[in-house]
Every structure is written in structure tokens, then in C-alpha cells.
Amino acid sequence: MAAMDDRLRERQERRVAFLRELYDTVDSSVTTFTGGFDVGERVGADRTEALRIIEYWAEKEMIKVDDYSSGMVRLTAAGVDAVETG
């Protein structure tokens, strides 16, 4: 059970780190698209996990996805607010 808890915590931490890294990458812009797979790689996620993270944040309306196959994403105003308010 502890190993599962650790895995869940790490997954949650990477999701939060992804949103923060995206925020830093685009300097809090809500109009600048960037490569979500690259952002995922910088926070330790492989392509499969990065796609799951992208899907998660898109579902929560924290990011907009231009193209899932290329992983092009941008922050939404809600995403900026989430990062800035912690």
C-alpha cells in the first residue's frame, strides 16, 4: 500500500510541476502555445505520462490543447490563477 501511495503522490507532484513549468515557460502568457511533451520531459514525465497530464489539465480547463498528437498547449486564465494562488 505504501508503494501505491508513493506512486500516486509522485504522479500528483508531476501534474502540479507540469502546470508550474508551463507557466514559467510561457512567462504566464495565456496566448503562447508551447510543446507540452517538452514541458513534461522537464518535470520527469515520459511522453505517455505527459499526454495523461495534458489530458488531465485540459479536462480541468487549466490548459487549452491545440493538437493532442503534437502536444501543443497553452495556459488558460484559470491555469495562471491556479499557479499564482498555489
Can you say where each PLM-predicted feature lies in the sequence?
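Short amphipathic alpha-helical interaction segments
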Residues: G44-E59
